[in-house]
Amino acid sequence: MPTNRNEEMMVYCSFCGKNQDEVQKIIAGNNAFICNECVELAQEIIREELAEEVLADLSEVPKPQELLHILNHYVIGQERAKRALAVAVYNHYKRINFHDSREEDDVELQKSNILMIGPTGSGKTFLAQTLARSLNVPFAIADATALTEAGYVGEDVENILLKLLQAADFNIERAERGIIYVDEIDKIAKKSENVSITRDVSGEGVQQALLKIIEGTVASVPPQGGRKHPQQEMIQVDTKNILFIVGGAFDGIEEIVKQRLGEKIIGFGQNNKAIDENESYMQAIIAEDIQKFGIIPELIGRLPVFAALEQLTVDDLVRILREPKNALVKQYQALLSYDDVKLEFDDDALQEIANKAIERKTGARGLRSIIEETMMDVMFEVPSKENVKLVRITKEAVDGTDKPILETA
């Protein structure tokens, strides 16, 4: 029996036996109580088990040739870029496994983030997405132009990490081994003597903010997004094992490369050509060119792997329409098959779709919108026409001079 009223009102944790005076907080449940210390202990046990599961998932990372084989199923062309990405991604996750098992005096492997340079619609984002999907790791995309340095209206760089956490269902251990793709990095190039007026005035500040999370830091992430404030509880995310893939079109960088190569040819003679006739200027880009474009050297140093993507040709775009596992032609054929209708594209129709994408300078990303324009009336009318069994898309249907051909049973 309790000897006094205070003892009668005392609450004890059902797990460790401590009373309310010995801990910060006790939570009441159905016929049981738990203290904050036991909650924290349980969370730590769960975190350790989840971390072990994540490590087990990454212990058998596909070899570079296997990754390339996976990419080839979905991505047409860009052979050099695919090889560079396959090697970089394999080495990154091998480094994580090595780091988690290494002895104290072993060599420390540094992280190798990736810089992808290529025109709009050449497949930069899709390559990063495909890699993340093939590895089954969380993936997030961020637009560098939406980011601002501290004190300005806009997104903090920590919000990039929030997107990754959301992709990982707020499993911190999984998020800390995910992939982040930062697009439009060229649009925040710092001002220089040869800079376009469209570049972000505060670009260098944003680059500095990105540098911190890319090189590896423990960042405080607001779980609800937005700006930080003192009352908001933060999630701590260690970025040292997050792979950052940074991409941009870098319009005009070819001129910087040409100028550099021209100076070398003048200075050392025609026999010392720095570029092969069959190699494009994009493949000849070096760190010096990127720095001259307006990316700070510290950030370039944290992006040691360069992957240059070429402008896609008409033939490339036709192959993209036809060949990948998720090719657009196959997708639209599947859509119409649900209405028991077969869909066919003439060869010159696919050529015309590719030509339109080239004219619009949208690359592969513009192909879907062109097909949508061509097939809008078909997809509206055909489901209501029970006797239609075949739709044939001709060149004239694509260029708008005629309608798609409908064949009935």
From Swiss-Prot:
Q: Does the keyword ATP-binding apply?
A: yes
Q: Name one GO molecular function term.
A: ATP-dependent protein folding chaperone
Gene3D superfamilies xrefs? 1.10.8.60, ClpX chaperone, C4-type zinc finger domain, P-loop containing nucleotide triphosphate hydrolases
List the GO biological process terms. Answer: cell division; proteolysis involved in protein catabolic process
Q: List the disulfide bonds.
A: none
Matches recorded under InterPro entries:
AAA+_ATPase, ATP-dep_Clp_protease_ClpX, ATPase_AAA_core, Clp_ATPase_C, Clp_protease_ATP-bd_su_ClpX, ClpX_bact, P-loop_NTPase, Znf_CppX_C4
Task: Give the source species.
Answer: Streptococcus gordonii (strain Challis / ATCC 35105 / BCRC 15272 / CH1 / DL1 / V288)
This chain belongs to which protein, by name? ATP-dependent Clp protease ATP-binding subunit ClpX
The record's listing under PROSITE patterns reads: CLPX_ZB (PS51902)
GO CC terms on record? Answer: HslUV protease complex
Q: Which CDD domains match?
A: RecA-like_ClpX
Q: Where is the ClpX-type ZB domain?
A: 1-54
Q: What does this protein do?
A: ATP-dependent specificity component of the Clp protease. It directs the protease to specific substrates. Can perform chaperone functions in the absence of ClpP.
- Binding annotation for Zn(2+): C13, C16, C35, C38
Q: Name one Pfam family in it.
A: AAA_2
Tell me the gene name: clpX
PANTHER family assigned? ATP-DEPENDENT CLP PROTEASE ATP-BINDING SUBUNIT CLPX-LIKE, MITOCHONDRIAL, ATP-DEPENDENT CLP PROTEASE ATP-BINDING SUBUNIT CLPX-LIKE, MITOCHONDRIAL-RELATED
Which sequence ranges are marked TM in the entry? none
Homology family: Belongs to the ClpX chaperone family.
Keyword Chaperone part of the UniProt annotation: yes
Q: Where does ATP bind?
A: P119, T120, G121, S122, G123, K124, T125, F126
**Keywords for the protein's UniProt record, in alphabetical order:** ATP-binding, Chaperone, Metal-binding, Nucleotide-binding, Zinc
Q: Share what the entry says about its subunit structure, partners included.
A: Component of the ClpX-ClpP complex. Forms a hexameric ring that, in the presence of ATP, binds to fourteen ClpP subunits assembled into a disk-like structure with a central cavity, resembling the structure of eukaryotic proteasomes.
